[in-house]
Swiss-Prot record:
A GO MF label: damaged DNA binding
Keyword set includes Plastid: no
Organism: Salmonella typhimurium (strain LT2 / SGSC1412 / ATCC 700720)
Gene3D superfamilies per record: 1.10.1420.10, 6.10.140.430, DNA repair protein MutS, domain I, MutS, connector domain, P-loop containing nucleotide triphosphate hydrolases
InterPro entries membership: DNA_mismatch_repair_MutS (IPR005748), DNA_mismatch_repair_MutS-lik_N (IPR007695), DNA_mismatch_repair_MutS/MSH (IPR017261), DNA_mismatch_repair_MutS_C (IPR000432), DNA_mismatch_repair_MutS_clamp (IPR007861), DNA_mismatch_repair_MutS_core (IPR007696), DNA_mismatch_repair_MutS_N (IPR016151), DNA_mismatch_repair_MutS_sf (IPR036187)
Physiological role: This protein is involved in the repair of mismatches in DNA. It is possible that it carries out the mismatch recognition step. This protein has a weak ATPase activity.
Protein's recorded name: DNA mismatch repair protein MutS
GO cellular component, one term: cytosol
A Pfam family the protein falls into: MutS_I
SMART domains named in the record: MUTSac, MUTSd
GO biological process: mismatch repair
Residues annotated as binding ATP: 616-623
Keyword RNA-binding (UniProt): no
């Protein structure tokens, strides 16, 4: 049976009717239905969960005459199972028992208390601590796209308005959302297909008026002018849908989402999806994190610092004032790194703890960690106080002190609290008098009974008097049958035994009532006091979030100071003049994985030297040289020091890379098609301030086609766009370009050949390479000797046929010789013999018809 199609629940048992009504409200997601100590799943949900979680599929009786497929998971292990489902892009509705089974007639009342989705999780167990977890929404109209992202674990809310498909693809690549909401009529499905966590949403959720209303309500504002997003209608449509979805799933207020920020293209260096992939910023080409720029650069000591550093790497800033401030801070912090990092490490992930506090899902250990973070602040303040730097002092001020909150948590929460508040033992002794009394009652029953027994023996003089307890009759005073006639008048008989009588007195009855309820009362009061702690902490949420942000930024900057010192990086200089000048530049990742010294290389790009044609053997280091230039520029524009002896860098608006390619089988695109699509994007969008890396353009097609395309692309970049370009090629004909165009120069990476062996020099020299060393590289790769021998023989034959092949002059007139000669069109021949001045109007008209027939 499929519950989504069965709307008549009357044939089912009352409990299954309740389940099916709840399930009908959440037809597309799994429903965890609480029954005692288990969460149960039924019907299709059970079948799906058994496959996804590898749990047993069983049957539960019958309802409506059919056996019910069922699967269950224990409630104490729910977080582990949720983590597995979320990682597979699934969403889960958590349905809890909210009624009292003792007073319920029929099934106990239940309701869905939260919905766990990949993009809205805040639980520590479900999140990757050093990676942002974003929920995103995308909207499209005739003018472009609207895109909004929210990190619910920090409250960071952003929107943008990508103008075209390429920019939108780059945004998706940069943000990599865990969950993506899109309208039911979204046209560009090819753009988002294959992404995880896709959620189709109704059109009305994207309405602009609803969006404005929702956002103003959330921020407590009358309009959105103060956020700079008032006129970003496409972005607001996406943001409105996103906020509605979060409210639907969280079912609680969201006080930590206090503002929204517009991300504008002109504020950061733009990198398309291919560039981010090729530069291996946070993910390598195989999809892992090893040997990436982040892997080398990220030695941050807090998870929130690590996440901020990765955001910086993916959004390099163009504002040189911000960059110079970061550089100054890094320089100022270099002497205090070893003192600061151990203290910062103790701060932990304050950012995400605050999000759970705002959502009121923070656990006792979260509050203990928050207290521990507050306890580090005095020492951090003391260490930073002596640093002579205005930006550092500004950060110190934003960190705050929170002495009152620290004192509150030190008084309220025990040193090592349990995982859940329902387990009790969270609130510290001495914090609340009534709680201490209830606990004393629950814990101190034995002491009280001993004291009562001694007192009553002395008062009555009865040496056989004992005080005891049993599960049926509760507390009692027992006197032997021989002395029972001496029992005081206030003793009320409770039970008669063979050799004794048992009594109760009002004081003991009152104590019994207290003890039996004390544990429950203590737990209930403890839960109430715990909730009150939230009420005391939440008014400080804005200041706490500012502090967490400042601590994360401090962690990033201290980390960059440590990396600069450890890896021998230098501070780059920003200039208004276009160009990049690097002395002894190094590749930040390759130099770390090499077992031998890295050969540093210079680079000089300027308006007079805009393009470098790079030649040299395969494996000679062309790609490394190009990528290191882009990575040095990228590091400079996040404010970091860079791997070089000296760097002077001018304005950069975009970084493009056309480096390597593979078949895009999913989209049915060949290597060459992928290559040309990326090239077209560069030629359409590059400017004179762009840094362009072009590696082996045209190699995916025939020699002459490839050479023609490479020549034309180089010409366009050098003459028309005038971008700062590194153009690596295996077409030696392109080394003629500097003779034909201004601003183009040849450089090469050399190698030495000795017999069948080859030594790569990895150093960049001016001028063109003398040969390609292709056969030597093939031999090095292990190609059989007889194949290499035959290749040498064939090479000599080809060179004897065309001895000047390598030096063939290729200019505009000779380019046409590369294509097969074409027959002249009959229409062209007819036109060549025509004198237009001698034609009458009638003859001209006849000629038009004649030419039409010839075409």
């Amino acid at each position: 049976m499929n519950e989504s199609f069965d709307k008549d629940f009357s044939n089912h048992t009352p409990m299954m009717q309740q389940y099916l009504k709840l399930k009908a409200q959440h037809p597309e997601i799994l429903l965890f239905y609480r029954m005692g100590d288990f969460y149960e799943l039924f019907y299709d949900d059970a079948k799906r969960a058994s496959q996804l979680l590898d749990i047993s599929l069983t049957k539960r009786g019958a309802s409506a005459g059919e056996p019910i497929p069922m699967a269950g998971i224990p409630h104490h292990a729910v977080e582990n199972y949720l983590a597995k489902l979320v990682n597979q892009g699934e969403s889960v509705a958590i349905c809890e028992q909210i009624g009292d089974p003792a007073t319920s007639k029929g099934p106990v009342e239940r309701k869905v208390v939260r919905i766990v989705t990949p993009g809205t999780i805040s639980d520590e167990a479900l999140l990757q601590e050093r990676q942002d977890n974003l929920l995103a929404a995308i909207w499209q109209d005739g003018k472009g796209y609207g895109y909004a992202t929210l990190d619910i674990s920090s409250g960071r809310f952003r929107l943008s308005e990508p103008a075209d498909r390429e920019t939108m693809a780059a945004e998706l690549q940069r943000t990599n959302p865990a969950e993506l909401l899109y309208a039911e009529d979204f046209a560009e499905m090819a753009l988002i297909e294959g992404r995880r966590g896709l959620r189709r949403r109704p059109l009305w959720e994207f309405e602009i008026d609803t969006a404005r209303q929702q956002l103003n309500l959330q921020f407590g504002t009358r309009d959105l002018v103060g956020f700079g997003v008032e006129n970003a209608s496409r972005g607001l449509c996406a943001a409105g849908c996103l906020l509605q979805y979060v409210k639907d799933t969280q079912r609680t207020s969201l006080p930590h989402i206090r503002s929204i920020t517009m991300e504008r293209q002109q504020d950061s260096i733009i990198m398309d999806a291919a560039t981010r992939r090729n530069l291996e910023i946070t993910q390598n080409l195989a999809g892992g994190v090893e040997n990436t720029l982040a892997a080398v650069l990220d030695c941050t000591v807090t998870p929130m610092g690590s996440r901020m550093l990765k955001r910086w790497l993916h959004m390099p800033v163009r504002n040189t004032d911000i960059l110079r401030e970061r550089q100054q801070t890094i320089g100022a912090l270099q002497d205090t790194v070893s003192e600061l990092q151990p203290v910062l490490r103790q701060v932990g992930d304050l950012e995400r703890i605050l999000a759970r506090l705002a959502l009121r899902t923070a656990r006792p250990r979260d509050l203990a960690r928050m207290r521990h973070a507050f306890q580090q602040l005095p020492e951090l303040h003391a260490q930073l106080e002596t640093v002579d730097s205005a930006p550092v002092q500004a950060l110190r001020k934003k960190m705050g002190d929170f002495a009152e909150l620290r004192d509150l948590l030190e008084r309220a929460i025990i040193d090592a609290p349990p995982v859940l508040v329902r387990d009790g033992g969270v609130i510290a002794p001495g914090y609340h008098e009534e709680l201490d009394e209830w606990r004393a009652l629950a814990d101190g029953a034995t002491d009280y009974l001993d004291r009562l027994e001694i007192r009553e023996r002395e008062r009555t003089g009865l040496d056989t008097l004992k005080v005891g307890y049993n599960a049926v009759h509760g507390y009692y005073i027992q006197i032997s049958r021989g002395q029972s006639h001496l029992a005081p008048i206030n003793y009320v008989r409770r039970q008669t035994l063979k050799n004794a009588e048992r009594y109760i007195i009002p004081e003991l009855k009152e104590y019994e009532d207290k003890v039996l309820t004390s544990k429950g009362k203590a737990l209930a009061l403890e839960k109430q006091l715990y909730d009150e702690l939230f009420d005391l902490l939440l008014p400080h949420l804005a200041d706490l979030q500012q502090s967490a942000n400042a601590l994360a930024e401090l962690d990033v900057l201290v980390n960059l100071a440590e990396r600069a010192w450890t890896l021998n990086y230098t501070c780059p200089t920003f200039t208004d003049k276009p160009g990049i000048r690097i002395t002894e530049g190094r590749h930040p990742v390759v130099e770390q994985v090499l077992n031998e010294p890295f050969i540093a290389n210079p680079l000089n790009l300027s308006p007079q030297r805009r393009m470098l044609i790079i030649t040299g053997p395969n494996m000679g280091g062309k790609s490394t040289y190009m990528r290191q230039t882009a990575l040095i520029a990228l590091l400079a524009y996040i404010g970091s020091y860079v791997p070089a002896q000296n760097v002077e860098i001018g304005p950069i608006d975009r970084i493009f890379t056309r480096v390597g390619a593979a078949d895009d089988l999913a989209s049915g695109r060949s290597t060459f098609m992928v290559e040309m699509t990326e090239t077209a994007n560069i030629l359409h969008n590059a400017t004179e301030n762009s840094l362009v890396l072009m590696d082996e353009i045209g190699r995916g097609t025939s020699t002459y086609d490839g050479l023609s395309l490479a020549w034309a692309c180089a010409e366009n970049l050098a003459n028309k766009i005038k971008a700062l370009t590194l153009f690596a090629t295996h077409y030696f004909e392109l080394t003629q370009l500097p003779e034909k165009m201004e601003g183009v120069a040849n450089v090469h990476l050399d190698a030495l050949e000795h017999g069948d062996t080859i030594a790569f020099m990895h150093s960049v020299q001016d001028g063109a390479a003398s040969k390609s060393y292709g056969l030597a590289v093939a031999a090095l790769a292990g190609v059989p000797k007889e194949v290499i021998k035959r290749a040498r023989q064939k090479l000599r034959e080809l060179e004897s046929i065309s001895p000047n092949a390598a030096a063939t002059q290729v200019d505009g007139t000779q380019m046409s010789l590369l294509a097969a000669p074409e027959e002249t069109s009959p229409a062209v021949e007819a036109l060549e013999n025509l004198d237009p001045d001698s034609l009458t109007p009638r003859q001209a008209l006849e000629w038009i018809y004649r030419l039409k027939s010839l075409v």
